[in-house]
Amino acid sequence: AFAMGIGPEAVAAGLGAFEPVPGRGTRFVGKHLVVIDEAYNANPDSVRAAMNVLAGEAGPRTFILGDMGEIGDSAEEAHREAGEYARSLGIDALYACGPLSRHAAEAFGEGGRWFETRDALIEALKGLRGTATVKASHFMGFAAVVRALQDNEE
């Protein structure tokens, strides 16, 4: 920006006006829960990045994971590694929904829970407190999970 003659004030104003796109890291701060919405897309790298962010947040910290799509033959292993990685970061709980995400919940161990349906997951999240990240590939429809968490806080 500076090379193009844009001054620091204009850069600061532009950055200050930035609003994240829903599903791409937006935050909702409720009375008892902070929701980090990462529900638009998921792959192994972006899941680890989202877990790294959550690990630095106030607890209890819950990672809500839906299936990662389009990752080929390594899908089960990638989900299992996600659960192991979340555990290694000290994340308090991992809630999962989707046939592949079941491997993440199992690998997470104690505090890992798997739900067969999105509705069952949403029901289990009622009363959740602390900080929660919602991460899934778009086809999982986890924007509904984000909305439910927000509605529970209003």
Residue ranges, per PLM feature:
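ATP-dependent carboxylate-amine ligase
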Residues: 1-154
